[in-house]
Amino acid sequence: MLAARTTGPQRCATIQERARATDWERALDSTASIVICVAAVAALLVAERRNSQVGKWFTKPVASAAFIAVAAISGALDSDYGRLILLGLGLCLLGDVLLIPEGRLAVFRAGVFAFLAGHVAFAAAFLTQPRSLPWLAVAAVTLVLALSGVWRWLSPRLPVDMRRPVQSYFLVIGVMTALACAVSGAGGPPIIAAGAIAFTASDIAVARDRFVHQEFANRAWGLPLYYLALVLLALSPSVISRG
């Protein structure tokens, strides 16, 4: 009888120890994936500086695959929220690959649509979480003003056949970012809003590089900000699952 009484607490302690060990393993694996992402982004910047297409093909897919790994390690497959985030990240990886070739407008347009679909997936993920209406309203107004200003600056420089896709992209990324802010405002992890805002800001660098003035400076700040954004979103399933 005494053995039976002590077995229960001992089993609970063993389960807790195993859970802690699993958490440590996930943290180490996630950290390793983030380090790989950082290293690949650094190498990508070197390739961009040297305008090496071979370097871009070697480094960009690795950097993007790393944020997929971060999401998987963070438990993205364990919830509807996580699975939608993982879907969005996968579409972003596809967009990253499609944006590597230069001077091919059709491929670039396909990349834009891949990112557009990715933002829809992120927005759907945020709709699975509680949201703050006041935060949603403030974020929406702020984003309308900011993106309208960017549109006025960018639209005269766009090819005619790209104006409608870019307008649609602005609309979707604005909705996605507003929803992210609403989730964080309702008590959700701040990294959700931070990731969405960083993503939106990084797209300005892409737009300037593609349609206004192509120079390394755009990529020097836009690429690190973009990968930071997606790593933050990739980490969010682990925080959501604990909340």
Regions of interest found by a model, annotated:
Residues 25-243:
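Polytopic alpha-helical membrane-helix bundles and their juxtamembrane interface segments
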